[in-house]
């Protein structure tokens, strides 16, 4: 009997897609039929953190010590025995997608990297915080590995805080290139949804004064690129740092991305 292929969901962008919400006991419990691919290409049940840019639960260094995040907003969960990277929106999206598709197995592909500008998501683009990392190139490698056992049904994107802070010129065209490159390099048809999130309303002035750079780009691409749309985040809350969504907001956001997916696919 052939194993059904996974429905794959690519998670890309910067820290608010990677996830920085506080982990709760619920977030450390498995969800039926929701899996994730790890950087070593192995599949596992998706429990938080579903991300590539922070330690996984049970990650150890070569000397046998647990590797923990140094994020001051993260808390030590007794269930994990270590600091847990924040919660993201991917698991919530996947939970609803599985239920809506006769309990299909959903495979999350976490590629988002905190702090990355849109330039890091160009072909050959470097992570400005780690010059040995190439977020877009690494995302393509991981996604292609995942495609051996599944088919990408959606790309979920949240990114732009860094570019608002940097007052990036030509953000619209840079993001358009990202969208088109993902479709080309992963052989995604024009009907595969590419869903973004607009900028929140809680940032400090150095970001909030320039969020139109990102929000206007999303409107333009919605009107000009096939199967591109975005969800609203303006009413959601931060975790205390005026930068990252809190856990309840990320659960809400995951449902909004799912609702947008269903709207775009007519399901």
Region spans (language model):
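Cell-envelope and extracellular/periplasmic
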Residues: 1-267
